[in-house]
Amino acid sequence: MSRVCELTGKGPMTGNNVSHANNKTKRRFLPNLSDVTLGSDLLDRRFKFRISNAALRTVDHRGGLDAFMAKAKDDELSTRALKIKKEIVKAQAAQA
């Protein structure tokens, strides 16, 4: 299972642990990922995602999965999330 957020593309970063004596040792900063189930109001379905907690807060802030996907950039989304976004866009067009 990869350590990359499916909605924002946030992944591991590298850096240093720095001691009091200023000794540096390499380390990895991993994203805080959670397995969550998000529901789409337009599609009336639920989807399981592995997303960062920051992305979960953003989804809540934007008003749900449908609103988040409408504003999300295609290059940040995973292939599965991109397919879901296209389904949501089709449903919005059919509803309008």
UniProtKB/Swiss-Prot annotation:
InterPro entries in UniProt: Ribosomal_bL28 (IPR026569), Ribosomal_bL28/bL31-like_sf (IPR034704), Ribosomal_bL28_bact-type (IPR001383), Ribosomal_bL28_sf (IPR037147)
Coiled-coil intervals: none
Any Gene Ontology biological process: translation
Domain of life: Bacteria
Species in which this protein is naturally found: Jannaschia sp. (strain CCS1)
Listed GO MF terms: structural constituent of ribosome
Gene name in the database record: rpmB
Source taxonomy: Bacteria, Pseudomonadati, Pseudomonadota, Alphaproteobacteria, Rhodobacterales
HAMAP family recorded: Ribosomal_bL28 (MF_00373)
Region: Disordered, residue numbers: 1-21
Protein name: Large ribosomal subunit protein bL28
Family: Belongs to the bacterial ribosomal protein bL28 family.
GO cellular component: cytosolic large ribosomal subunit
Pfam family, one: Ribosomal_L28
Keyword field: Ribonucleoprotein, Ribosomal protein
